[in-house]
């Protein structure tokens, strides 16, 4: 059973997300939070497989919340839900430690697919976020090293860092470094020694 924490400041949204997950046999809403601070307190006290986070809550939220949760529970996966489809939001969320990014206009089925995929170690982007990243990155991908491009291709295919490392004969740390470089435009294309 995949234990999910839902963090959204709108009760009606949390209730809708709970209804969607109630229709599955492998996803369980283990807790819900109405703020980023509440989510952080819950994560400190409990273990969850995936945290679903609203990008735009008042107070602690967005990229800072992702970073704080990642620092607290590095193995917990995070799916960011947002009304923003622009590539900057998705890229920053992934760089901060999220494993997935969905716009709130995504279909229910895509939410369930995303949760399962990232719980298994993969990465998931909504169609809108992926399209925006591709459009923004049409020339950006050309600045990636061959190895970074290969890591990106496998991330998009849904593989997690461990699987990518095994496939490319790299350590998980090296894969994570490549992932950081891919989603940080200032570092894209700069190769570490020996890569």
Where are these regions (language model features)?
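Active-site residues of response regulator receiver
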Residues: 8, 54, 82
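Acidic, metal-coordinating helix/loop segments flanking the phosphotransfer/catalytic sites
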Residues: 32-50
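Acidic catalytic/metal-coordinating carboxylates
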Residues: 35-38, 58-64
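Basic, Lys/Arg-enriched C-terminal extension of HTH/homeodomain DNA-binding domains
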Residues: 39, 180-195
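Short amphipathic alpha-helix used as the core "switch/output" element in two-component signaling
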Residues: 41, 63-75
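The short loop immediately C-terminal to the conserved phospho-acceptor aspartate in CheY-like receiver
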Residues: 49-51, 55-56, 77
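Short, flexible helix-to-coil linker/hinge segments that flank and couple to helix-turn-helix
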Residues: 88-95, 99-152, 191-194
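Helix-turn-helix DNA-binding segment
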Residues: 134-180
